[in-house]
Amino acid sequence: MIKFSSFIKSNNFDLFIFLPIVFLIIIGVFGIFSISMRIDEKYDLLIKKHIIFCLLGLVIIIVCSKLSIKNLIIFSIIFFVFSILLSISTIFFFPETKGASRWVKLFNFSFQPTEILKPTFIILSSLLLGRYYSKKDFSFILNISLFGLISLILLSQPDFGMFILFFSVWIIQILNSSLEKKIIFPIIFLFLLSFIMSYIFLDHVKFRIDNFLFSNIGDNYQINKSLESFSNGGLFGQGIGNGMVSKNLPDAHSDFIYALIGEEFGFITAFLILAFYIIIYVRIFIISQITNNLFILNSLTGLGNILIFQTIINISSSLNLLPTKGMTLPFISYGGSSIISSSLIIGFILTLINNAKKQ
């Protein structure tokens, strides 16, 4: 225990963020272990891959938390460009999965490059917004252009849920930057127009929204099973491997992992998960308010928002409060791309917090 505490202190980790992340990872490992018990031929592979990605995620958090602001920006630029190129390649060169072209597939490895765009774009957007605020140059046009490129990629794949996530975080960054209303209102109008056009022309978007608003029991099998699992779980759950979610839901390891936890681990564990996410978000918000550096403020706000918004979308989908988006629960759902992206977000947050405290 002494060694662990000295390790935390020597790395300047913020315990209000790092410890909840560790707890979320542990809960996720138990959840994936439960699912892997149901898959005889992939029992060892599924849980082993998940544990490997979790360990890799912790390494990423530690390494990124040591970056200077300068190196953080350089790192983000390099990986943003790399992820953009890979994301474009998924549309033209890689086969579709469930009607979408989001994955780079090499041998037995699949990777979703748009996941890396989340933390890196937030850093670049914060940098450009800070520059525009002080110099009133072309940087805001470049910011809009980068977001427009990401939007085009996401809607082409198509990944409307990710588009909503990006836009929500980006527009809050802009509002935080105190830009003129004549700039903000046209952007909001373009978003509403994009939403309407997506509903009209993108069949998968129309299907999910219609299914959410007008579906009956037969149309909403996964959601009904998800809701049923929460009522079955009670306070303490039915025990690892004793639930029905992993048997009946093909996406129990990703989209509906929260439903599995609610059934097998109970309401108390499901509530603790929410509490951990809230603690992380509140801590990020508190630190962001003590800095006078616009770049750090926008970066912390954006990274915190994208993490909590993704959490809200996943959990709300499980509870039928939002249409299903195919979005993972950070640090809990199975998926290497998601774990790496979430780890980058937390690593970036920790290094930004360290710099904010030094001011």
Tell where the protein language model's regions lie, with residue ranges.
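Loop-to-helix entry and N-terminal half of a specific, functionally important transmembrane alpha helix
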Residues: 288-326, 332
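Hydrophobic alpha-helical transmembrane segments
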Residues: 52-56, 60, 264-281, 345
